[in-house]
Amino acid sequence: MPKLKTRKAAAKRFKATVTGKFMRRRAFRNHLLDHKSPKLKRHLATKAVVDERDAENVRLMLPYA
């Protein structure tokens, strides 16, 4: 059976944890940050867990993660 290809776009955006979940960056922290509070920007800087409903799609895109 041939090797499965990894979706490179997904590989740059998601990282797998030891428990098999996937971590992602949060949205809304790219630009237009002047009016956002420091507390909000700190919160947006943290990683988030991919929702379980989307995790299966991410797993298919990253077969070796």
From Swiss-Prot:
InterPro entries: Ribosomal_bL35, Ribosomal_bL35-like, Ribosomal_bL35_CS, Ribosomal_bL35_sf. Keywords: Ribonucleoprotein, Ribosomal protein. One of its GO terms (molecular function) is structural constituent of ribosome. Gene3D superfamilies: 4.10.410.60. PROSITE patterns: RIBOSOMAL_L35. GO terms for biological process: translation. One of its GO terms (cellular component) is cytosolic large ribosomal subunit. NCBIfam families: rpmI_bact. Belongs to the bacterial ribosomal protein bL35 family. This is Large ribosomal subunit protein bL35. It comes from Prochlorococcus marinus (strain MIT 9313).
